Amino acid sequence: MKRTYQPHNRPRKSTHGFRARMATKNGRNVINRRRAKGRKKLSV
């Protein structure tokens, strides 16, 4: 059986990357929450 996680950088960045997050209001909320929490990495 094939495992579920087959990493590829392009889809990873296009769905979870900083630019993708900033593109929508909810994504900006995610970034702001992570900033408020003091996360070292805001996105992948």
UniProtKB/Swiss-Prot annotation:
GO terms for molecular function: structural constituent of ribosome. Transmembrane segments: none annotated. Pfam families: Ribosomal_L34. Belongs to the bacterial ribosomal protein bL34 family. GO terms for cellular component: ribonucleoprotein complex; ribosome. Keywords: Ribonucleoprotein, Ribosomal protein. The keyword Ribosomal protein applies. InterPro entries: Ribosomal_bL34, Ribosomal_bL34_CS. GO terms for biological process: translation. Residues 1-19, 31-44 have a biased composition (Basic residues). Residues 1-44 are annotated as: Disordered. This is Large ribosomal subunit protein bL34. It comes from the Bacteria. HAMAP family: Ribosomal_bL34. The keyword Electron transport does not apply. It comes from Sulfurimonas denitrificans (strain ATCC 33889 / DSM 1251).
